């Protein structure tokens, strides 16, 4: 992870060095050499992804400086929302690293307290996925929609037994069910214990108003005020991510070009499923 960026970009190396000082460990070494068991811990992967995105953005603007003045809105999926706030000028890099590290620790702790999982249900609309969840949910357990990514791709989160029952229902109905390699049931009330810690961390984050608006995960609406972000971010970890609706919001605004900055191709893939004509360029490793 980040090998290409670190090899070619002095700016990227500088950001990773700064982040390592804040975190108290060599983040670049962890990204390059692992072990994956350490890198994949939510408490480590969240700052790693944030720093990677910031480094990719710096590298992107070095190559394409003209784009900086053309940006009309930003969005990011789950943790990516913090990278989007950084890109919009609402969150400094240093405070962003500390904030996502606190978020990662809080979510890791909440996930470790309960046996829970996430999974993707493929080829099914929202109403049918909700019906599967309602049928599979075990007494006293949580099972709910977590990420509404794009048509035919919805992630669910919940207690492990409810996930198991849902997998049987979905498979029996002839649809694809994919368990996700994540620490726990993100974007559900299982993460409720993490909210207080995140709110405390936000008090030190010194968010400011954004240069361009953010399309927020929780409501797919435009927001540009620091006071709004401080309320949206805690809600996000216990609420479904309305990603498809966020993409449609940007399309309805008349956005003519999308740029995906950072590792992975989530935007590229989900945008293609939402509107095949929408152009998207990806920049990362």
Write out the residue ranges for each language-model feature.
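Non-catalytic positions within long, well-ordered alpha-helices that form the structural scaffold/packing
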Residues: 251-254
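FabD-like malonyl-/acyl-CoA
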Residues: 1-130, 180, 257-284
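Alpha/beta catalytic cores of group-transfer enzymes, especially the acyltransferase/condensing modules
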Residues: 21-25, 68, 88-239
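A short, well-structured juxtamembrane/interface segment
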Residues: 241-249
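NAD(P)-dependent dehydrogenase/reductase Rossmann-like domain
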Residues: 162-163, 201-202, 277-285
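Soluble or luminal CAZymes and related metallo-dependent hydrolases
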Residues: 11, 238-242
């Amino acid at each position: 992870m980040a090998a290409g960026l670190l090899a070619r970009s002095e700016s990227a190396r500088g950001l990773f060095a700064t982040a390592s000082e804040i975190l108290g460990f060599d983040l670049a070494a962890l990204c390059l050499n692992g072990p994956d068991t350490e890198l994949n811990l939510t408490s480590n992967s969240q700052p790693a992804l944030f720093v990677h995105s910031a480094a990719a953005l710096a590298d992107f603007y070095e190559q394409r400086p003209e784009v900086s003045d053309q940006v009309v809105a930003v969005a990011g999926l789950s943790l990516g929302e913090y990278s989007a706030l950084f890109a919009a000028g609402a969150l400094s890099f240093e405070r962003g690293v500390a904030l996502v590290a606190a978020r990662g620790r809080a979510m890791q702790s909440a996930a470790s307290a309960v046996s829970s999982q996430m999974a993707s249900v493929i080829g099914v609309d929202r109403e049918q996925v909700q019906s599967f969840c309602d049928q599979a949910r075990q007494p006293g357990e949580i099972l709910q929609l977590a990420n509404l990514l794009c048509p035919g791709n919805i992630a669910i989160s919940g207690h492990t037994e409810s996930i198991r029952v849902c997998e049987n229902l979905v498979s029996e109905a002839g649809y694809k069910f994919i368990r996700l390699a994540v620490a726990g049931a993100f974007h559900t009330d299982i993460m409720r214990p993490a909210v207080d810690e995140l709110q405390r961390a936000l008090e030190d984050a010194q968010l400011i108003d954004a240069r361009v608006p953010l399309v927020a995960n929780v409501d797919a609406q435009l927001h540009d005020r620091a006071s709004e972000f401080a309320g949206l971010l805690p809600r996000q970890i216990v609420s479904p991510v309305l990603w498809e609706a966020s993409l449609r919001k940007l399309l309805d605004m008349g956005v003519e070009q999308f740029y995906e900055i950072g590792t992975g191709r989530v935007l590229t893939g989900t945008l293609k499923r939402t509107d095949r004509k929408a152009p998207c360029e990806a920049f990362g490793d």
